[in-house]
Amino acid sequence: EVAGISFGGQMHGLVILDEKDQVIRPAILWNDGRTTKETDYLNQVIGKEKLSEYTANIAFAGFTAPKILWVKENEPENFAKICKIMLPKDYLAYCLTGVHCCDYSDASGMLLLDVKNKCWSEQMLEICGVSREQMPELFESYEKVGTLKPEVAKELGLPETCLVAAGAGDNAAAAVGTGTVGDGQCIVSLGTSGTIFISSENFGVDPHNALHAFAHADGHYHLMGCMLSAASCNKWWMEDILQTQDFAKEQAAIQSQGRNHVF
C-alpha cells in the first residue's frame, strides 16, 4: 500500500495562479532565455553584492525572479492577476493536496529566498513587486505538506491518508539518491544541463563567482555550478564531428590509459 508521495522536478520555472488557483499563462521554464534584460538589471542596478546579501546568490536568466520581472514588464495584465507564485513540481503537489507549498532547495533557485535564514527575502519580494502572501508556504524536503484530497485519492486509487512530502529540486533529489549528503560530498551530473554539486553542512557565499549557494534536501546546504547545455554537447560531438551514432563503439575505443589528461 502506498504510504506517501513526493516530487522531484526541474527548478526555477514560473507558474502563476489567479484568485481561483487557475494557471494564468504557460509556465516559463528554467531554460527560457528571454530574461536577459531583467537579469542585467538585477546584477548591475541592484548589484551582485546586494543580491548576495539578500539571497546568497546572484541573478541568472534561468532563475524565477527575473521571470517575474519579465511578466511585470511585458504582460502587466497577467501580473495583476497573480495570487500565487509557484514552481512546476510544487504546482503538482498543490493539485494533490490543495496546499500552496515549496521546499527550501527548490525555493533557493528562485532568487527570492533568504537561503541562510530560510525565509522569503522581503527585499527581493519588494524589488519584484510581489508580497509574502503571494508566495507558497515553505517546507523542508522531508516534511509532510498534507494528504491527498478525497477526489484525488479516488481518482488515483490511493487512500486519503496517503501523505505528500515537499520533495526537492531535481539536483538536490538526485544528490540524496547518490548519497551526496552531509559535508564535502560531490557529484557531477550530465543531463539537459550539467552540474557540479557539493554538499556542505556549513553556509558560505561569494558574490564574485557564479556558484549557486542553495539549501539542500538533507536540511543543510550545497554549492552548485551549472551550465545550460551538457549531454546534448556529447550528442553534437558524436553526430556532427565524428559523424556517427554508434556510442557503444566510441566508448569501447576510449583508452584506459592516457597522457596529460587526454584519453
Annotate each PLM feature.
Residues C128-E140:
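A conserved helix-loop-beta module that forms one wall/lid of the active-site cleft
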Residues T36, N43-I58, P66-C101, L111-E122, ...:
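Active-site core segments that coordinate phosphate-bearing ligands/cofactors
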Residues E140-L148, A168:
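Glycine-rich phosphate-binding loops at beta-strand->alpha-helix junctions
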Residues E1, L29, N43:
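N-terminal phosphate-binding loop and adjacent alpha-helix
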Residues I28-L29, D106:
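Residue-level structural signal for beta-strand termini and adjacent loop
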Residues D32:
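Carbohydrate-associated surface elements
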Residues E1-R25, E53, K81, E137, ...:
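N-terminal glycine/serine-rich phosphate-binding loop of ATP-dependent small-molecule kinases
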Residues F7-M11, S141, L190-S193:
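Glycine-rich beta-strand-to-loop/alpha-helix junction loops that act as flexible
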